[in-house]
Amino acid sequence: MPKMKTHRGAAKRFSKTGTGKIKMAHAFTSHILTSKTRKNKRNLRKGGIVAASDHKNISCLIPYK
């Protein structure tokens, strides 16, 4: 059976941790920031973990990462 292909767009956006969780960066941080509060922007800088409902689909996109 041939190797699975990695989805290159997903590989740039997600990475796996040592325990198997998938890390991601938050969206809504590039423009239109004046309407967002300081607290909101500060919390968006922190990384996030992909939800359990999305974990299976994203892990299929990045099988070797």
From Swiss-Prot:
<dbReference type="Pfam" id="PF01632">
    <property type="entry name" value="Ribosomal_L35p"/>
</dbReference>
<dbReference type="GO" id="GO:0022625">
    <property type="term" value="C:cytosolic large ribosomal subunit"/>
</dbReference>
<comment type="similarity">
    <text>Belongs to the bacterial ribosomal protein bL35 family.</text>
</comment>
<keyword id="KW-0687">Ribonucleoprotein</keyword>
<dbReference type="InterPro" id="IPR021137">
    <property type="entry name" value="Ribosomal_bL35-like"/>
</dbReference>
<dbReference type="InterPro" id="IPR018265">
    <property type="entry name" value="Ribosomal_bL35_CS"/>
</dbReference>
<dbReference type="InterPro" id="IPR037229">
    <property type="entry name" value="Ribosomal_bL35_sf"/>
</dbReference>
<dbReference type="InterPro" id="IPR001706">
    <property type="entry name" value="Ribosomal_bL35"/>
</dbReference>
<protein>
    <recommendedName>
        <fullName>Large ribosomal subunit protein bL35</fullName>
    </recommendedName>
</protein>
<dbReference type="GO" id="GO:0003735">
    <property type="term" value="F:structural constituent of ribosome"/>
</dbReference>
<dbReference type="GO" id="GO:0006412">
    <property type="term" value="P:translation"/>
</dbReference>
<keyword id="KW-0689">Ribosomal protein</keyword>
